[in-house]
Curated annotation (Swiss-Prot):
It comes from the Eukaryota. The lineage of its organism: Eukaryota, Viridiplantae, Streptophyta, Embryophyta, Tracheophyta. It catalyses: RNA(n) + a ribonucleoside 5'-triphosphate = RNA(n+1) + diphosphate. The gene is rpoB. The keyword Nucleotidyltransferase applies. This is DNA-directed RNA polymerase subunit beta.
Length: 1060
């Protein structure tokens, strides 16, 4: 069995490839810079560049809000020539700072962890397709995609004439393009396989009779120039530069794909589109037109490439060098103009490179803030694959075939783990064994079955290559050698499923989880779940909150250990030695005569406000080995991932409190801190140096609001703060208006010219819902380029302890999610035959319709494991061993638990897995036996404390005069269509009228209503229409429709027209 590669390995390999190869490649492209008079030459030495070790550590960069980066030094030479002498000066100069990847596979920019995710793009090369035109006739096209995404289309019509389109503009003859590229008619006809098809264009000799005419025609179409341009050498050079060199650059990957598709032998370093490529592409298009070739599947992974962190960082480095070149040219010109002596150091500085990476990490769509909700989230985020981003697709234009699962995804992209919503299928996740190959392709490992050697050899295959082999399905892994010779096994061949003899098998899978992502691989019994529910579970595991008392799962899959190890949450011994000292802050390890200090994470805030904390697990004097675990991190126990709790669950309805995914829980989960979690919130205030003042003397504020401030006006560590308390006292000076001057102030200003200032209270106050304990206060200085713009910010970190409560969201590992609806006293909960009350009650109707039966297997096996004190690690698709293997395993464990505990009710043959339980309120047994078990239940980050919101007054929409929408905008309630139906159903006409009209969007009436409610008067009835109705009338008028209403008399039925 092969070992699973590190989950962060793709990020590490990409960054190392950028450092080892990408920097050298881009520096080799840096040109030799000369002035117009050739007096000064400036160039870089490719052989000599170095990255120095970062000046700060990762922890300090996060704490002080700095960028964890390394300085890049390059050797440069300057040659200065004048009439008599020649000066040569060589220096090692600093050209900028490059952010360095941390041990988490992420970058630290301004104290924030950021990750660069991988992007899937269409690979450069040529692709042949067939589409139906408006007349229902098949049109065959060959599309040449350049390295940057530009397109050149070859199209063959019914008369077998070949046309060319540039960026989907008007088509022109292929002979015009070839002539503009430098070929004459004779060379064209001699180098194609079907010259007779090209002769049909020769009637128009005026356009293609000469190279000049072809260049003019092509330039007119390409540049969209009106009129008749005149040929010149500059026009020809402009066309060569803008089109044939910039827009038609294939790159190394594109050149390789063109050679393989068209059977060419053009050197790999020739990365531009050549006339030979166009001729070969036209020949292949003619063959496909007449049925002598195959079309390309654009969604096949062999036609895609991965744009990794190495490619993105190298691209930004090349952009920075272009800016550096322009700076050097400008400084050389300034040196000659102002007659000052240049040196390599003063020709360039570090600003272009540093600013380029600063903008990239802040604004680029593929640079995202690392999600650190729990350890699993960190490693999954770095393994994402995105079709979105620059050069990629958009969520609005991506079609269903692009989002759908493709057979080439097998073992490379997880078919389950993807986003929900508009980005479904566009953001995927790497399979756990996949890796990125040399040419940007996704490779998957297989075992090659050889007759010569008894053992199997592992090899990585790129997409498309495995289709030429007979690949055995995963169930063949369980067959021993004796049975294999007689068995027929299912296999894959050319995207089809076959049944073949074992002797015909050439490759087989290496691991049961090979085609799943990390999130899907952590779901036990995943084969018994619907794929939609498995997708939800993969996403919800990343939303689990680390609990204060973590507990590892009874039923797992075996990947929990490596997930915890690769997440960086654990403290690992890098050397063997002896523990010299340990406390909650650090561990001192002595070995080889040195003492190594290992700092531990102490109540660190993640960007999702969860608490990251490490607990030492070694004692003083203990000898440890390299790789041993020294401290557990958040959501880890025993070196394994521990996201939730094993709780006793009954699947039964209970008084309607678990209707529609609601969950009923016991108060034991609250009082014993089973689902208690810690959350850290950050509150920040900026202080301008000079005028603003931090102080604890704030006038006009009550004393109890300032009770936690120290003498400097900042809240003290360890203080317990409530809503409205002052965290930082700040006064901002403001000038008094002329009209508010007192007479004596006006006299002083007139005589002495003095201005009177007052101070405005701009303190940092604790908002609603922020109560907790202050655990840290930081002063952070952010310096701008201008010395006068230096600002300071004070950050206050407050720790909150949150028990589980009504409104919180919980979920299992099978897509079974729900909201806490009621917390019952433990004596009222249903209890088992041994007297134990259950902890949660789930609705059984949520299982059959959603087809996630895996939760039943996990629940029953978890109960058996709890009684037998065992933990199970089960690989998926265990039916490959025998039929009903999962059911047999669960029932056998329940039966054994029943025997060992002498409790026959645990396994009753009449209803295996079910048991008679009793109503805690009456003591009577329920009518039917109920499934009970111990599944692994997670508490998710969607908590009611973050969702609940109230508003008394606030801002209104300028257009509709209704309250704004959303908690972030401090919005209010908006009565929608379904709310109106609910009120109509109860016949509350007056409440409905008030909520829809003068309490909502009637500007004048809502002020009167407020006054009458305060003083206890009768609510007035407004005479005119509310603002939303007036807006509706105005919109109708913009469509030239006038809205009026009429009164019909009962006596005369005459229409008395009255204006609206």
């Amino acid at each position: 069995m092969s070992t699973i590669p590190g989950f962060n390995q793709i990020q590490f390999e990409g960054f190392c490839r950028f450092i080892d190869q990408g920097l050298a490649e881009e520096l080799s492209k840096f040109p030799k810079i000369e002035d117009t008079n050739q007096e000064i030459d400036f160039e870089f030495f490719l052989e000599r560049y170095q990255l120095v070790e970062p000046l700060i550590k990762e922890r300090d960069a996060v704490y002080e809000s700095l960028t964890y980066s390394s300085e890049l030094y390059v050797s440069a030479r300057l040659i200065w020539k004048n009439d008599r002498r020649r000066y040569i000066q060589e220096q090692t100069i600093l050209i900028g700072k490059i952010p360095i990847m941390t041990s988490l596979g992420a970058f630290i920019v301004n104290g924030i962890y950021r990750i660069v995710i991988n992007q899937i793009l269409q690979s450069p090369g040529i692709y042949y397709q067939s589409e139906l035109n408006d007349n229902g006739i098949s049109v065959y096209t060959g599309t040449i995609i350049s390295d940057w995404g530009g397109r050149l289309e070859l199209e063959i019509d019914r008369k077998a004439r070949i046309w060319v389109r540039v960026s989907r503009q008007q088509k022109l003859s292929i002979l015009v393009l070839l002539s503009a590229m430098g070929l004459n008619i004779r060379e064209i006809l001699e180098n194609v396989c079907y010259p007779e098809l090209f002769l049909s264009f020769l009637n128009d000799k005026k356009k293609i009779g000469s190279k000049e005419n072809a260049i003019l025609e092509f330039y007119q179409q390409f540049a969209c120039v009106e009129g008749d341009p005149v040929f010149s050498e500059s026009l020809s050079k402009d066309l060569q530069k803008k089109f044939f060199q910039q827009r038609c650059e294939l790159g190394g990957i594109g050149r390789r794909n063109m050679n393989r598709r068209l059977n060419l032998d053009i050197p790999q370093n020739n990365t531009f589109l050549l006339p030979r490529d166009i001729l070969a592409a036209a020949d292949r298009l003619i063959r496909i037109k007449f049925g002598m070739g195959t079309l390309d599947d654009m969604n096949h992974l062999q036609n895609k490439r991965i744009r990794s962190v190495a490619d993105l960082l190298q691209e930004q480095f090349g952009l920075a060098l272009v800016r550096l070149e322009n700076m050097a040219r400008g400084n050389i010109y300034a040196a000659l103009k102002h007659n000052w002596t240049p040196t390599p150091q003063n020709l360039v500085n570090s600003t272009p490179l540093t600013d380029t990476y600063k903008v990239f990490f802040r604004l680029h769509p593929l640079s995202q803030v690392l999600d650190r909700t729990n350890p699993l989230t960190q490693i999954v985020h770095g393994r994402k694959l995105s079709y979105l981003g620059p050069g990629g697709l958009t969520a609005r234009t991506a079609t269903f075939p692009i989002r759908d699962i493709h057979p080439s995804h097998y073992g490379r992209i997880c078919p389950i783990d993807t986003s929900e919503g508009i980005n479904v299928g566009l953001i995927g996740s790497l399979a756990i064994h996949a890796r990125i190959g040399r040419w940007g392709s996704l490779e998957s490992p297989f075992y090659q079955i050889s007759e010569r050697s008894k053992g199997a050899q592992m090899l990585y295959l790129s997409p498309g290559r495995d289709e030429y082999y007979m690949v055995a399905a995963g169930n063949s892994l369980a067959l021993n050698q004796g049975i294999q010779e007689e068995q027929v096994v299912p296999a894959r061949y050319r995207q089809e499923f076959l049944t073949i003899a074992w002797e015909q098998v050439q490759l087989r899978s290496i691991f049961a989880f090979q085609y799943f992502s990390i999130g899907a691989s952590l779901i036990p019994f995943i084969e018994h779940n619907d794929a939609n529910r498995a997708l939800m579970s993969s996403n919800m595991q990343r939303q689990a909150v680390p609990l204060s008392q973590s507990e590892k799962c009874i039923v797992g899959t075996g990947l929990e250990g490596q997930a915890a190890l690769d997440s960086g949450a654990l403290a690992i011994a890098e050397h063997e030695g002896k523990i010299f000292y340990t406390d909650t802050d650090k561990i001192l390890l002595s070995g080889n005569g040195d003492t190594l200090r290992i700092p531990l994470v102490m109540y660190q805030r993640s960007n999702k406000n969860t608490c990251m904390h490490q607990k030492p697990q070694v004692r003083r004097g203990k000898c440890i080995k390299k790789g041993q675990i020294l401290a557990y991190g958040a959501a880890t126990v025993g070196g394994e991932l521990a996201l939730g709790k094993n709780v006793l669950v009954a699947y039964m309805p209970w008084e309607g409190y678990n209707f529609e995914d609601a969950v009923l829980i016991s108060e034991r989960l609250v009082y014993e801190d089973i689902y208690t979690s810690f959350h850290i919130r950050k509150y920040e205030i900026q202080i301008n140096q000079g005028p603003e003042r931090v102080t604890n003397e704030i006038p006009h504020l009550e004393v109890h609001l300032l009770r936690n401030l120290d003498k400097n006006g900042i809240v003290m560590l360890g203080s317990w703060v409530e809503t409205g308390d002052i965290l930082v006292g700040k006064l901002t000076p403001q000038m008094v208006k002329e009209s508010s001057y007192a007479p004596e102030d006006r006299l002083l200003r007139t005589i002495l010219g003095m201005r009177v200032y007052t101070s405005k209270e701009t303190c940092l106050k604790l908002p609603i819902g922020g109560r907790g304990r202050v655990i840290d206060v930081r002063w952070v200085q952010s310096s701008k380029t201008d010395e006068t713009e230096k600002t300071e910010s004070i950050r206050v970190y407050i720790l909150q302890k949150r028990e589980i409560k009504v409104g919180d969201k919980v979920a299992g590992r099978h897509g079974n999610k729900g909201i806490i609806s009621k917390i019952l006293p433990r004596q009222d909960m249903p209890y088992l035959q041994d007297g134990r009350p259950v902890d949660m009650v789930f609705n059984p109707l949520g299982v059959p319709s959603r087809m996630n039966v895996g939760q039943i297997f996990e629940s029953s096996l978890g109960l058996a494991g709890d009684l037998l004190d065992r933990h199970y690690r089960i690989a998926p698709f265990d039916e490959r061993y025998e039929q009903e293997a999962s059911r047999k395993l669960v029932f056998s464990e329940l039966y054994e638990a029943s025997k060992q505990t002498a409790n026959p009710w645990i396994f009753e043959p009449e209803s295996p897995g079910k048991s008679r339980i009793f109503d805690g309120r009456t003591g009577d047994p329920f009518e039917q036996p109920v499934i009970i078990g111990k599944p692994y239940i997670l508490k998710l980050i969607h908590q009611v404390d973050d969702k609940i919101h109230g508003r008394s007054s606030g801002r209104y929409s300028r257009l509709t005069q209704q309250p704004l929408k959303g908690r972030a905008k401090k919005g209010g309630q908006r009565v929608g269509e379904m709310e109106v139906w609910a009120l109509e159903g109860f016949g509350v006409a007056y409440i409905l009228q008030e909520m829809l009209t003068y309490k909502s969007d009637h500007i004048r009436a809502r002020q009167e209503v407020l006054g009458t409610i305060i003083f206890g008067g009768r609510i007035p009835t407004p005479e005119d229409a509310p603002e939303s109705f007036r807006l509706f009338v105005r919109e109708l008028r913009s469509l030239a429709l006038e809205l009026n209403h009429f009164l019909v008399s009962e006596k005369t039925f005459q229409l008395n027209r009255k204006e609206a």
